[in-house]
Amino acid sequence: MSPAPAILALRRVYNFCLLVDEAHGFMALGKSGRGSFEWWQDCGYDCPLQEVDIMTGTMSKSLCCIGGFVSANGVYAAELERQRTLQHQNGAETLSTAVLVRILSLINKPKLIKERMTALGRKASFVADCLAQAGCDILSSYGSPVVCFPVGTIQQASRFHEEAMERGFAVACGVPPATPLWSCRVRVCIFATTSWEDILDLINMIIKVSCKLQLKGITATVFTPDTLPKQYLDDPSIAEQSIKSDASICSYVESLSKTYPGGDLEAKAPLNLAQSQEAVEASVKAFSKYGLGPSSARWFYGTFDVFIALERRLAKLYPSLQRHSGRCRAMLGTDAHTMMLSLLSACANPYTSGVMNILLIPTTASLAVQDGADLNRPRAETKIIYYEKLDNLVAKLRELPIDASKLHLTLYLQTTSHDGSSILDLPATVQMINSGMNDPNQLKGLKLILDDSGGLGKVGPHHLGYLDLMERDHGVSFLNQSLGIKLAPKTEIIVTGSFFNAFGQQGGYIISSASFIEVHTVSSKSFVFSTPPTPIQAALSGKVLEILSRGTC
């Protein structure tokens, strides 16, 4: 736990801006779920939230949703309003209605929150007490719902994870560089809704696995049900408040439907009314089957079949890409803006030893693209070049170092203009690259990022985007023919786009060769650390793509 009392004492002396990130504390710490500062207040310290200038948090970890929030005091509140306006102007996505209703339905129930926070504190403290009694060195703050303890080397951490999974428990491991080489950690997350029976099984599993791996200091101990703390009956006023809160939200939604009537459902281009209804029904079925879905990174919880189905459909969406790249795969993102930022950040990393990676980005690229390219610290092996128009690209290329055998180009291209009036001429662009290089044959490799955010849902015979249009006009060999015999084998093509721009609901995607996607699931920070899309989003996007693939009316 961060030393909030000491930080506030320093702030009162030096008057600095204090930003508190409650990504792990919101609805997880404090008697009313307000985070670490409230946790310290509960412990008797003077930590008023009013002295925090900016606070951030997420909805995923405790509200089982996607999205996050920023709140600010004083002068920073005005800047926050300005940033919000800029976000919308730069195409930031809005949260799905189902997610907003979920959030409102939970935070408007203070009695339920207080009861859950009390239960969470009791369960987390019980786990820590039992493990400490067995000799485990608890590294996390007392009462924290994330219980952390050391297990030794990377090999021991890996074996601990494997043994826990075999017993039906998922644990998170912390390894170098986040931890010392000899002191890897295991983190166990406790939930207020976790049953006491599961809590007991978890404790005994940790001790049993620790003894099997011969972790230092752990003694064989078995905790039985009679060691559990006293249970209390539910307060009936909690259910009463929850019912009233839900009724209020339902009434609000009904009033909106009367204020903005539309025959229940309107057609959403490029779909007709019947097809729009079919897509909505698919998302409703997904909600009935999965709820709002998981609230942690994909690798932690595994995956759902609805995600796999959408990824497989995307991977086979463009025959020309398969003809060029061989087996393709796809990956999903919660929002296209963050996914694009993370993609450019990953592509801005050094290519390989002794090779300079040159990123060529138009000045008209979105803020996410520019921020992603500039996110990493400057390195000698990477250079970012911004150009105004494709006509200027040749001049930029001719300014590159003469030793082309040690160059790799990463070129970001928008498949359509912002207003949709022009379409990318890929063959001409490739020709410019060839003419701009001193010796194209010495180029180490080329990576083309085709941003189809303005193409999907708008262009092509099936409204499936840029490659859909090119395949109709030039056939499935379009990409290989555009690149040419010499350049095609050493070119990686990445197609990315936005479900938000195409269909009006959150989400983004990346399609490329299987080898690239498998690496990018590790190099993409947005994939590793962000909450996945909801099953509702995946089902809706998948159904719309299915409808478009078979042809619209």
UniProtKB/Swiss-Prot annotation:
Disulfide bonding pattern of the chain: none
Phenotype of gene-disrupted mutants: Impairs the production of fumonisins.
Inducers of expression: Expression correlates with fumonisin production. Expression is positively regulated by the fumonisin gene cluster-specific transcription regulator FUM21.
Signal peptide extent: 1-25
GO cellular component, one term: membrane
Residues bearing carbohydrate: N480
Pathway: Mycotoxin biosynthesis
Cofactor or coenzyme needed: pyridoxal 5'-phosphate
A molecular function GO annotation: pyridoxal phosphate binding
Protein name: Aminotransferase FUM8
Species assigned in the record: Gibberella moniliformis (strain M3125 / FGSC 7600) (Maize ear and stalk rot fungus)
